[in-house]
Amino acid sequence: MDPVAGEQDEKSYGYDFIWETAGKQQVVSNYCFYGDYLAKKGMLEQVRDFFSQGGGKNGDVANHNYDKALPWPFDEEDYIDVVTGCVAREQLRAHPAEQPFYMMVSFCGPHKPYDAPQRYLDMFPLEREDDFILPEGQIISDEDKESLYRQRRSAKAMIRLIDDQIGETLDVLRERGMLDDTLIVFTSDHGDMLGDHFMIQKGVPWKQSVGIPLAVRLPGAAPVGENIAPVEISDIAATVLDYAGLDAQRVLSRSWPAYNDIIPSRSLLPVLRGEQERVRDFCFSE
């Protein structure tokens, strides 16, 4: 996996600019634009050593292969999600304000290894609340609880850091007069068990793992509040295309790279405009 070498292949999906990270764990063994950034600053091997220290695998708590939740030991400006936010804002500042654009900004956190910078950790006390949802008769050792408490704290800190990065990015849109014309979609790919059901990380069909947020700001539309109808991440594609005035089903029915014949994508604009309550009765997840 080398996003730097495969940049032209990735542009075949329609992007004019790509700056991709392999992820905190993958940067240990793979190269990417974030790895290139670190290498140019002479930091790559140091960061790889740090990432190799802590980061357990998916599975149950009992395997003791849990994350050490060590704070990021380098400058905050070099943290993966801070760099990602800075690159996004650079692109927005360079883009002609009168031209339409599509931008996907994918932050790595909150994700293992739990490595929030100390400044953000200091915003949250280390709460030792033994409120884990567990199978009947299941017990978590004090050692494992302490690790999970640290992970929970770091997850909150990483979310706060991402909040700040999103806020700064919205500020750029506002400063350039682009905010009121921009459809904004906020979501994630998965949640985290963080000790519930005696599990860590993801990959199981519990609410903590598959229940993720989808928040949308539609310019010119009155807020419709909270809607608990099921949606899929794939619905974002049709929603964006529909908002851009394109025939989503025609565009997504191409043989490559789309796969709409396998996982249909449905526009959420009717829901966002308050015209209907839902676009699907069930969703698919794996």
Sequence positions of predicted segments:
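Catalytic core of tubulin tyrosine ligase-like
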Residues: 236
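Short, solvent-exposed loop/turn segments at the edges of secondary structure
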Residues: 10, 207-211, 263
